[in-house]
């Protein structure tokens, strides 16, 4: 991937008392909202407009379909957002990008190496539907390819990605979800491609299935269990006999 693309990031409103430029101990906030985070990159006409709350995506504006896409459908039943507002912000960023590029003497953005982690949403049970999550952090600039592989073959069904979400250091993170049914015959990889990586990174995942006990192990376990049981019987018998003897010697003949 070429690394000479320019980037502009606009945060139009920040509904929080937290200073992103200050230290962590400056001001604490219970909730943080990014309302109107606009990203545009050129060439390629790549951009996004999102609203976030406490690090979770509320919605984004699909630039191709020109519509608002809610992270959860229930959000769209509570409030409305016209996609034209996001499209206008993208157009403004696109207009300003050329000016800022010239002022920066066409200096390209520094490419950071992203970090990826793969984990299941719920405890894994073979044959039970689950979701794999690929969490990719420290993304900059926000252009990345995330691909799911099952047994080294690309998977597209059951895949969902969030938009780029903003970190406090102005880098980004992104989550990719894959719905699947765990099987001991399948292995999965999350493939990450980014300008900051010399080669694609594969994060491997496969279900951890306890190895069955061998016949020798089963025999040893049974023998140990039987031995412990026999020892318990012998010790119990000894205590009973001692108790009876102790009770017999403590008896005294009563008056006639």
Curated annotation (Swiss-Prot):
GO biological process: adaptive immune response; antigen processing and presentation; antigen processing and presentation of exogenous peptide antigen via MHC class II; antigen processing and presentation of peptide antigen; positive regulation of T cell differentiation
Gene Ontology terms for molecular function: peptide antigen binding
Transmembrane segments: 219-244
Subcellular localization(s) per the UniProt record: Membrane
Cystine connections: 134-190
Positions in the Cytoplasmic compartment: 245-256
Record-linked CDD domains: IgC1_MHC_II_alpha_I-A
Residue stretches making up the Ig-like C1-type domain: 114-206
GO cellular component: external side of plasma membrane; lysosome; MHC class II protein complex; plasma membrane
Residues bearing carbohydrate: 145
Membrane association type: Single-pass type I membrane protein
Keywords: Adaptive immunity, Disulfide bond, Glycoprotein, Immunity, Membrane, MHC II, Signal, Transmembrane, Transmembrane helix
Alpha-2: annotated segments: 112-205
Residue numbers spanned by region Connecting peptide: 206-218
Similarity comment: Belongs to the MHC class II family.
Alphabetical list of PANTHER family matching this protein: HLA CLASS II HISTOCOMPATIBILITY ANTIGEN, DQ ALPHA 1 CHAIN, MHC CLASS II-RELATED
Protein name per the record: H-2 class II histocompatibility antigen, A-D alpha chain
Natural source organism: Mus musculus
Taxonomic lineage of the native organism: Eukaryota, Metazoa, Chordata, Craniata, Vertebrata
